[in-house]
Amino acid sequence: MNRDLRRDLYAVAVAALLVTAAAVAGIAVKRDKDVLHVGWPPLYANWLPHTGPGTPAAITVAVAVVVYGPPLAARLPWRALPWACWAAAMAWTFSLALVDGWHRGVARRLTTRYEYLQVIDRFDDIPRALRDFTGHILLGSPDHWPPHVAGHPPGATLTFVLLDRAGLGGGAWAGVLVIAVGATAAAAVLVTVRALADESLARRAAPFLVLAPAAVWAGTSADGYFAAVAAWAVAFLALAVTGHRPRTTALASGLLLGLTVHLSYGLTLFAVMATAVLLLGSRRLRILPYVCAGLVVVPAAFTLAGFDWWEAYHLLVERYHQGAGGFRPYGYWVWANLACAVLVVGPATVAGLRRTGARLTRWHASPVAERRLGLLLCAALLMLLAADLSGMSKAETERIWLPFTTWLLAAGAFVDRPRAWLTAQATLALLLNHLLLTGW
């Protein structure tokens, strides 16, 4: 065992201790007074060992990616690789979701009393619904919105309203949409890493972007869809600053960034990632006008329709403290959230982040491409830590932070023995999905 691998295992052991501490402390808090409002701390889940129709498929996909993922990622033509990543990520996510069965795992996930599909009929008149949106955020308001509708800008709900208008109504189509679109996040991160670092690192990261425990929550939660939209906004920006059809990709990035902040208030933190991409690019000044032009389109449309983003955000903060966020203890969740993140990204990412830190501390001795990928990963970590310290993400971060944790998976590009680490990733995901009944 070489020194680097030994240090990787030390980092994984420390991460495992963090998860163990969060579980033990969480159980103790629940026994004393259940203010955590989660079933199996630190995760929003319940202990329920089970199998389902997705079990054979999930094992098959896992074995296939472990065995064939690294060589295929190294040999496939570049144009085919993002498509292959998307297909594999979609197969992995669908199979994990189906471990809970079609209805419980996919079709009914977005139809509970907390979710967006509960209010589709209240958007028959979309302009009026947008004008009145802020009037239904607080719990004391008439016909207040369900938690997830109140907790997000209306762009999130409008996604499912428009899907319904297209004739694809109901929980099944909504579940299929968020899984299919969410799986494209793997391709978006891949494109970004190639544009800003190099193709070799992107190819090494590819299997880790696919075979991640994060897929347990990407199927089926709307946050997986949000993660994909944000990831493509960054990917298009990376293409723009590196000279790939700069005007078109810059405009597309701006449009998606504008949509991103109207899907989730917390995704304004992607300003950090966008700044990092601009700093890593060589054409930042030329493309900024196009990014800005695209950026104003979606916010302007919502504003003209009568939705006040800032008013809604301030009301959301109040609503958050009216519910579980008001009694969930910050002193526990500020570090237990990080334990959730460990379970989402898996041991390979922990080891990869350890190696990222080592490369950044040896700045001049590290290859330029590795330093650039390291800075991108630091931006993702900074977003995650800012969300954590804000106190607006107490629990359920295994899904809420998917837009941030998706980027950390690229740290897998730095590890040696990829098949062993991919096996660890798959094993963790399969255990989580089969031993726990997760909320999403």
Language model regions located:
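Start-transfer (signal-anchor) and selected internal transmembrane alpha helices
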Residues: 1-19, 41-112
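Membrane-lumen/periplasm interface segments of specific transmembrane helices
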Residues: 21-34, 259-262, 276, 280-358
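Transmembrane-helix motifs of polytopic, lipid-linked glycan transferases
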Residues: 64-71, 173-196
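Specific aromatic-rich, kink-prone transmembrane helix
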Residues: 188, 226-243, 249, 408-411
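Membrane-interface alpha helices of multi-pass inner-membrane proteins
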Residues: 210-217, 248-276, 294-300
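Short acidic/glycine- and proline-prone juxtamembrane loop motifs at membrane-interface regions
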Residues: 214, 218-226
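Perimembrane helix-loop-helix junctions
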Residues: 234-243, 247-251, 268-294
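Membrane-interface helix-loop-helix junctions at transmembrane boundaries of multi-pass membrane enzymes
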Residues: 284-289, 354-379, 418
